[in-house]
């Protein structure tokens, strides 16, 4: 059984914007890659590069730190960007600004519930391992039938349903 301490941690949580409903990709305004400073479309998922990442109320070091993420590899969604700053949204719906160097293009996801990793992308395929809720997994790929291939920190690699993951819907 795979286990994980809290997949994310915050110091002094503070709501920065109005409450955000569950992520619904139909309600996300997409900006094409040719219209962003990075050359990548927004929104998109990335992960935290460091164990500690300061999240600020605005896109500069002059803005106060709202909270600090304490989980390397945590998936976040970029919802806006400037040349050096990215506005991110986490699994809780909180939004804050972080510096571009604190983010990695490596794709990770969070298991929303205890999740089976299966040998093949089928519900009746052999179970290889189980994860607990809030486990961060590396996203390898997703297929058109709603299954994603993921890898655990312990090296287990298998398939799980896309709907059981946060960070795989774009």
Where are these regions (language model features)?
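SH3-family beta-barrel domains
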Residues: 10-57, 68-72, 79-82, 86-119, ...
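Short, small/polar residue-rich loop motifs at catalytic or cofactor-binding pockets
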Residues: 62-63, 123-124
